[in-house]
């Protein structure tokens, strides 16, 4: 199998994961059978019991931020279907992880608990709550927000793999009308 075909196939697999996770998360019901719920009623999740267990696990660990995981698979699918490649994988995936964790802490600090189909849960799941709580114990509320904001900004350097200020300046320079 050639490298081009392999990339397309991988792109289709990532797109399938996006669809499965997206539908599982959208049709999630906290009352479906799952790791911590016993139920005799029929599963409401459109992806069946596997979707129910998957969505419950993602919501418990990552909360609403779990939707970013699905969209990450969508991003990877477009990348591979268009036969592009991430040239520097380590910085890119480090940036993705740092972005996800810092955004989880920030959003958990700001939004706290949310109501999901009649059940209260942490916006960023157990992971976001534990990280936010740990940072707040060490640095206080302002320090936690500052540090997570700083890490969010740093993650953009890893993701874009280019100087951010320079990229912003180039973007604005192109949009200015030509002076006569």
What would you call each of these model-derived segments?
Residues 1-180:
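Alpha-helical transmembrane segments used as membrane anchors
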């Amino acid at each position: 199998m050639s490298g081009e075909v392999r990339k397309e196939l991988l792109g289709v697999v990532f797109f399938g994961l996006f669809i499965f996770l997206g539908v599982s998360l959208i049709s999630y019901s906290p009352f479906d059978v799952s790791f911590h719920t016993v139920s005799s009623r029929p599963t409401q999740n459109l992806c069946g019991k596997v979707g129910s267990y998957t969505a419950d696990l993602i919501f418990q660990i990552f909360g609403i931020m779990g939707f970013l995981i699905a969209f990450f698979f969508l991003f990877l699918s477009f990348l591979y279907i268009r036969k592009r490649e991430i040239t520097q994988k380590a910085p890119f995936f480090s940036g993705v992880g740092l972005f996800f964790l810092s955004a989880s802490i920030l959003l958990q600090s700001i939004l706290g608990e949310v109501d999901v189909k009649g059940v209260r849960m942490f916006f960023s799941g157990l992971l976001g709550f534990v990280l936010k709580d740990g940072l707040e114990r060490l640095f206080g509320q302002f320090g936690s927000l500052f540090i997570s904001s700083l890490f969010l900004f740093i993650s953009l350097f890893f993701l874009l793999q280019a100087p951010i200020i320079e990229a912003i300046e180039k973007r604005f320079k192109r949009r200015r009308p030509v002076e006569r």
